[in-house]
């Protein structure tokens, strides 16, 4: 994202202030859920500062966690009826499947796009459409590798149903993976989420499934890389 120009007459910052300003503009902010994972190794680095290997290892760990929990700014498209990717990653499946039973969306298969997130991807989840949250259901389960087809059915998951102003129901499901053992969902029933708004996070490798109403035109392709909140993956009927 480009930095905003400085208005005329604005007092110029000091060289140190200017450097800090540049860093803030270039480095993505950190999701709050990542703070403990960054602060803990930083504390170890401080306590073990006299031992070079401890200090370096702890700082490396803190940097890796900061990269994992990064929360970059995104600009969703301003078009009616589009569905954006709820996560960064690779499209693993473009098919039809029965939505999670806990969402009460029926037993008929609906269009689905599954996105697999590696440990190197941004791991926050964003609302694929703008709408009201009508259901949020967490279901315990297994921790199979998230790229397996069975993961949607047997792994731990958090399912959320959104009702758009146009009357469509879109479901987005956070699925835990082999390393992902903690699903965070900040959205609650009754909340209204703008398209692309961050609502949750899955720690360390995961998958996100999106279910659409019948008649939706799927635009995503298997193997495609997605950018959460920006890549259009479907057009609602």
UniProtKB/Swiss-Prot annotation:
Its cofactor is pyruvate. Its EC number is 4.1.1.65. It comes from the Bacteria. GO terms for cellular component: plasma membrane. Pathway: Phospholipid metabolism; phosphatidylethanolamine biosynthesis; phosphatidylethanolamine from CDP-diacylglycerol: step 2/2. One of its GO terms (molecular function) is phosphatidylserine decarboxylase activity. The modification Pyruvic acid (Ser) is found at residue 206. Binds 1 pyruvoyl group covalently per subunit. Disulfide bonds: none annotated. The record marks 205-206 as: Cleavage (non-hydrolytic). Keywords: Cell membrane, Decarboxylase, Lipid biosynthesis, Lipid metabolism, Lyase, Membrane, Phospholipid biosynthesis, Phospholipid metabolism, Pyruvate, Zymogen. Its main location: membrane. Is synthesized initially as an inactive proenzyme. Formation of the active enzyme involves a self-maturation process in which the active site pyruvoyl group is generated from an internal serine residue via an autocatalytic post-translational modification. Two non-identical subunits are generated from the proenzyme in this reaction, and the pyruvate is formed at the N-terminus of the alpha chain, which is derived from the carboxyl end of the proenzyme. It catalyses: a 1,2-diacyl-sn-glycero-3-phospho-L-serine + H(+) = a 1,2-diacyl-sn-glycero-3-phosphoethanolamine + CO2. It is a peripheral membrane protein. One of its GO terms (biological process) is phosphatidylethanolamine biosynthetic process. It is found in: Cell membrane. The active site is at residue 206. Heterodimer of a large membrane-associated beta subunit and a small pyruvoyl-containing alpha subunit. Belongs to the phosphatidylserine decarboxylase family. PSD-A subfamily. Catalyzes the formation of phosphatidylethanolamine (PtdEtn) from phosphatidylserine (PtdSer). HAMAP family: PS_decarb_PSD_A. This is Phosphatidylserine decarboxylase proenzyme. It comes from Rhodococcus jostii (strain RHA1). The lineage of its organism: Bacteria, Bacillati, Actinomycetota, Actinomycetes, Mycobacteriales. The gene is psd.
